């Protein structure tokens, strides 16, 4: 079921939703499932699952030099979304982000989500890297959420990003987007920010 159906009926029926983070790498799902077990009595309409991109950390070597390593502290958004939907039969909305993902990564993520029967997405640019002054896309990645949304819409229309037709397209994704109510820090003004939201 598409989340828009819940939202369109919102005036008649109030409800809750929750947002969860994937477990830290190596921690398993037990604590997350205990949290959902405690919250499911509120009958959540859906559960959002955040996505966290990789970051670089510096580790000291035995010789005193530093080495830069790529670390993803919270992997598994797609797998967690599938596990929650399967275990609890509650619709899920995984976050799909530009940060740390190439267009190919996103295409494979969309395929994985479709295989799992997950049709609701929250499409976001994602945060800039911790030490960066401004957002820098991954090589062959998207700079803006609007570009990512175009890729999802092309997938919905039955085409991979290289233009190849999808032989057996699955259910189309229902996409949500987000904005900052006070204006995004990179937008020159509120009007321009609204223009990008409407794209």
Predicted regions and their residues:
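Active-site mouth loops of central-metabolism enzymes
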Residues: 15-33, 91-104, 174-194
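Glycine-rich, proline-tolerant flexible connector loops at the mouths of alpha/beta enzymes
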Residues: 23, 42-75, 129-139, 199
């Amino acid at each position: 079921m598409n989340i828009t159906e819940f939202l369109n009926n919102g005036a008649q029926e109030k409800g809750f939703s929750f947002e969860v983070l994937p477990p830290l790498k190596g921690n398993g799902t037990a604590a997350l499932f205990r949290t959902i077990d405690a919250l499911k009595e509120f009958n959540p309409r859906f559960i959002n699952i955040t996505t966290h991109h990789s970051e670089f950390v510096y580790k000291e070597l035995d010789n005193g030099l530093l080495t830069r390593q790529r670390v993803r502290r919270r992997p598994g958004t797609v797998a967690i979304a599938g596990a929650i939907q399967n275990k609890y039969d509650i619709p899920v909305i995984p976050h799909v982000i530009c940060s740390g993902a190439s267009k190919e990564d996103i295409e494979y993520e969309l395929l994985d989500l479709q295989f799992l029967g997950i049709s609701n997405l929250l499409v976001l640019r994602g945060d800039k890297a911790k030490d960066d002054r401004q957002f820098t896309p991954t090589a062959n990645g998207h700079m803006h959420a609007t570009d990512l949304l175009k890729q999802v819409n092309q997938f919905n229309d039955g085409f991979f990003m290289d233009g190849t037709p999808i032989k057996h397209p699955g259910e189309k994704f229902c996409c949500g987007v987000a904005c900052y109510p006070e204006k995004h820090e990179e937008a020159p003004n509120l009007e321009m920010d609204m223009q990008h939201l409407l794209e």
